[in-house]
A protein has these predicted regions:
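Glycine- and small/polar-enriched repetitive beta-structure motifs of secreted/surface proteins
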Residues: 1-191
């Protein structure tokens, strides 16, 4: 164990192979293993309800409420301030960028997502297999599945669409708003 910072790994009882650096980093972690938590309150609730293993959370509040309420969070990489903040029990996610995959509230269990960029997929809750790369790409996705968006604000309003592809600045920007769905749609270029 390596704990540097006020109340870093504060609650540890039977954990090993963890690194926590920063104010209250890994604060609630009790028995989880193989986690790297760097930043103020990074992984703060990790290990609260069950054993969460093999996570990397770097940035202030990155993964702050992971494992806060229900199940364990495993195999996640959250890099950036607030990346994956409310991702309660999601597994195998990669969120890179400020507010990437931030989510809201507890009970979020998105799995197997790749969200890269400032606020990429920031509203995600239970969506799975989402790929979003770009500034606010897939910004509003909550429960969508298997969508791919590449570009500035691509699929911005697509909350629940499935299997859509958007490539380009604002590609598919309006779909998902006002009852529209981006189910199986393909958007190329700017809109």
């Amino acid at each position: 164990l390596i704990a540097i910072g006020y109340q870093a790994l504060y609650s540890v009882t039977d954990a090993d192979n963890n690194i926590a650096i920063g104010y209250q980093a890994g604060y609630s972690l009790t028995t989880a293993r193989y986690n790297v938590l760097i930043g103020d309150q990074a992984g703060y609730s990790l290990g609260t309800s069950s054993e969460s293993n093999e996570n990397v959370m770097i940035g202030n509040s990155a993964g702050k409420f992971a494992d806060a309420a229900t199940n364990a969070a495993h195999y996640n990489v959250y890099i950036g301030s607030n990346a994956g903040t409310y991702m309660d029990d999601g597994d195998s996610n990669v969120y890179i960028g400020r507010d990437a995959g931030k989510g809201s509230g507890t009970g979020n269990n998105a799995t197997a997502n790749i969200l890269i960029g400032y606020q990429a997929g920031t509203a995600i809750s239970t969506g799975d297999a989402e790929t979003a790369v770009g500034y606010q790409a897939a910004y509003s996705v909550t429960t969508g599945n298997s969508n791919s968006s590449l570009g500035y604000r691509a699929l911005y309003y697509n909350e629940a669409g499935t299997a859509a592809v958007a490539i380009g600045t604002n590609a598919g920007y309006m779909f998902g708003r006002g009852g529209h769905s981006a189910q199986g749609s393909i958007f190329l270029g700017s809109t």
